[in-house]
Amino acid sequence: MTSHSLVPQAPGLSLPVAQMRSVFHPVDVERKLARLQEGSQQREYDNLRSVYERMLERGPERFQVKPRGIPYMAALYDQLPNFTDVLDDVRRHVALAQDSSDGLEVTPMLLLGPPGIGKTHFARQLAELLGTSMNLLPMSSMTAGWLLSGSSSQWKGARPGKVFEALVEGEYANPVIVVDEIDKASSEAQYDPLGALYSLLEHDTAQSFTDEFAEVAIDASQVIWITTANDSRGIPDPILNRMNIFEVQAPTPEQARGIAASLYAGIRAGHDWGRLIDPEPLDDVLDCLAQMPPREMRRALMTGFGNARLDRRSTVEVADLPRAAAGRSRIGFMQ
């Protein structure tokens, strides 16, 4: 698939560098559309025809983005101090793509660690850094074997898979796709829900990935794959061998305070009402927040901000935080 530059690199800007990349060949779609039975009234063919027409209407080009440079990753090290090894790996890939016309290629990664330590939050922050989209696929609640690869148009209720949707219906050729809790993928599904990953996690075969519904090759080689798990023992070895594996530890108490302070500043800066809130949180508020898993900190802060404003105050106090969260430790710290 082809790509060409859209935004030239210029010093002093933090906007991502973007170019356009084709994620499918229109001639393939036109050929498939022509072969459909013109007079068929079967819903599956109508749905398939609609997908082909939509593909041709939108065209094949999508944004392919990458960070302007390594310095713009510095903030993530402050926000995600327990993900240093993962960020170092991404940083190496950014260095390879910097000062070149090449797109950013990131080796698929598996983030191993207990629930609540910020694995999904990391994925969101990485997507934001890259300027691309993030698609979350929670495997623990998905039972369909065709989740990633789509189901044949011959089947009732057939539809494209999530990879096809992310690339064809989305705006980016290199979205972040998070396969959350991959170790909990259902083993009772009629088809292996992880089967498509054998080709999707390999750069060469991902260049011509075929969704079973559309049966048109799409270029999924630029997708940034992040998988998460609590335990790697339930993941097939061939999939593990296709990824860089990182064991993410719970943050230390000091790191947890830093995460809480970063979330406080980020939420405040992201809302107009933030100007009514003190720029810095109180120390005892940070101490309280630092006892929570990162995934709970944001919810607690939003409650705290709201309670402070209900009382017409600019300062968030410990009493403003949720009682349950403020009253007990919820995270195992690294000492």
Language-model regions, residue ranges each:
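Conserved C-terminal "switch" segment of AAA+ ATPases
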Residues: 62, 171, 232-238, 249-315
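AAA+/P-loop NTPase substrate/partner-engagement loops
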Residues: 129-159, 166, 256
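Interdomain "pre-motor" coupling segment immediately N-terminal to P-loop NTPase/helicase cores
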Residues: 17-71
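Walker A/P-loop
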Residues: 104-139, 168, 237
